[in-house]
Amino acid sequence: MSEHPLAQEVLSRLSGVPQQKFQDFSTLTEQMKSSQYDVFGEGKKSLALSRFKGSFLKKCPGVSPGMVCCNYYVVNLSKNCIYDCSYCFLQDFLGNNPMQVAYVNVEDLLVELEEVFTQYPDRNFRVGTGELTDSLALDTIIPYTDYLLPFFNR
């Protein structure tokens, strides 16, 4: 993963921060769960860079029978959050996985979006990026906006 261009950019921005390589960061998560009182707080101190496997673009999780779809979709380029907002549902929702994870294969997302948008040229898509994180919280470290803004601004 450290060979990926976005991973290299992130790691260069964090050059003074200790770094570890893991085949599976669930090992670190389990280690954290067994040794920390405030697992969620401890998870905010770490950032795992990973490759997202699967489809990035998901239908709105609020779609249910009898509801009219407004073509809202979500893209999760990362999960968890560095903030500690007491009102946020992520405090409980992601409690079983406290690790802050950022996916670096943004080019796969852009290819997927291009394919879907090309397949449905007459459909308006609304795409949000903040379902499982504050999507701008780490933008100075993980510059997702450098990729997404030019794509959506065309």
Model-derived segments and spans:
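A short N-terminal interaction module
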Residues: 1-28, 39
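Glycine-/small-residue-rich active-site loops that bind phosphorylated ligands and cofactors
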Residues: 2, 80, 136
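N-terminal [4Fe-4S]-dependent radical SAM core
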Residues: 26-77, 92-99
